[in-house]
Amino acid sequence: MAEILDKVDRRLLEELKINARENIATLSKKLGIPRTTVHYRIKRLVEEGIIERFTIKPNYKKLNLGTTAFILIRYDPDSGLTQRQVAEQIAKIPGVYEVHIIAGEWDLLLKVRASNAEEVGRIVIDKLREIRGVGQTVTMVSFDTVKEEI
């Protein structure tokens, strides 16, 4: 099991979240620790599974995916599928970026990206509602994203 992260590990993770391509020399200067220590800590964080991968943050507007919507779904238990099976089918739909099984009045929460609201509607009507086990849905289109972390 991973040991508790110290202050330096946490600062290193924050820097890598901002720019995963930051070089070790720059990270060393920012954190005030030797380059060998930065290298060792990154290696350890990867080996312990704390860092799962190094990734990018796309500009979705430039990719013509500037509309973000969140969709709540009620699971239909009479479908013959488990809630997890329904979630896994939903995860295969192009444009669905996140699928969460949640507690409360609703059973699933999705994050969808599309070029516009009409395309979100097509995803909901033509794809999502065709999946067995999907009951009622509520779609909420985001006006603006104030904060989004990777």
UniProtKB/Swiss-Prot annotation:
Keywords: DNA-binding, Transcription, Transcription regulation. It comes from the Archaea. SUPFAM superfamilies: Dimeric alpha+beta barrel, Winged helix' DNA-binding domain. Residues 5-66 form the HTH asnC-type domain. CDD domains: HTH_ARSR. GO terms for biological process: response to amino acid. Pfam families: AsnC_trans_reg (PF01037), HTH_24 (PF13412). SMART domains: HTH_ASNC (SM00344). One of its GO terms (cellular component) is cytosol. GO terms for molecular function: sequence-specific DNA binding. Gene3D superfamilies: 3.30.70.920, Winged helix-like DNA-binding domain superfamily/Winged helix DNA-binding domain (1.10.10.10). Residues 24-43 bind DNA. PANTHER family: LEUCINE-RESPONSIVE REGULATORY PROTEIN (PTHR30154), TRANSCRIPTIONAL REGULATOR AZLB (PTHR30154:SF34). This is Uncharacterized HTH-type transcriptional regulator PYRAB16920. It comes from Pyrococcus abyssi (strain GE5 / Orsay). The lineage of its organism: Archaea, Methanobacteriati, Methanobacteriota, Thermococci, Thermococcales.
